[in-house]
Amino acid sequence: MLDTDLCWCGSNKAYKDCHKQFDEHLNSIKLKAFKGQKRPPRNIIKNEKDIEGIRKSGIINNGALDLIASKICAGMDTETINLLAHNYIVEHDGIPACLNYEGYPKSICVSINNVVCHGIPSRDIVLKDGDIVNVDVTTILDGYYADASRMFMIGNVSDKARKLVEVTKECMEIGIKAIKPWGFVGDIGAVVEHHAHKHSYSVVEDLGGHGVGKKFHEEPFVAHFGKKNTGMLLVPGMVLTVEPMINMGARHVVLDPVDEWTIYTKDGSLSAQWEKTVLITETGTEILAD
């Protein structure tokens, strides 16, 4: 690519003024194939317009979660939570990304107690005192996706359940802190797994984070276990989710054979999850949705 050509990232800037220096640095890094190290594909690296689009989508997504935080309580059915999010997103010109995604029937996921993820909202599922609840919301605005989830503790939650929720949030925060430009995806999982195991919890391995922004799910897959200095290289312009699912019991999960969406802990133990959408910058990270 010539210096005066338009950059491959779609910024409409000359290559020399955009990603030339980036490419030179990227190509100078010697990767170790035996550690699964690899360069990211160009199509997952966002330009300034993309980042601003995801940021705006994240503002709506955050607003939906803030609204739910102000309303959620014992006695509320999970379909009401779904409608709160759906209506908020639509009223702000967004689209609920989950609705009809690969056949998913609702606008958000609401996962209670031993449900690890993908709980389907229903009038028949009513929150009770002592429940721990994950609400997972993804918004599309002008073609850009932002994804986040939060845990809510309903009424008088047991000390054991409260600790699981708190440690899971710490796992997410530690995972985000491990993200460094020119580091590796494995750096995230290594610290998350260490922190979870320190508290005698397990990390769900079947599911994880993912690239996000132009699509709901992009490369890379972000495992919340593993070893440092392995996997895809993390570079400025990548956007991904950090969303550890931490179980009080064993890590194994099962899929509901009827709805084919809801995922439970195999042993019936409690599970918790927190999620943020994270941009990798030249100097660290920026949270785009939380």
Identify the function of each model-found stretch.
Residues 3-4, 11-290:
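Active-site neighborhoods and metal-handling regions in enzymes and metal-associated proteins
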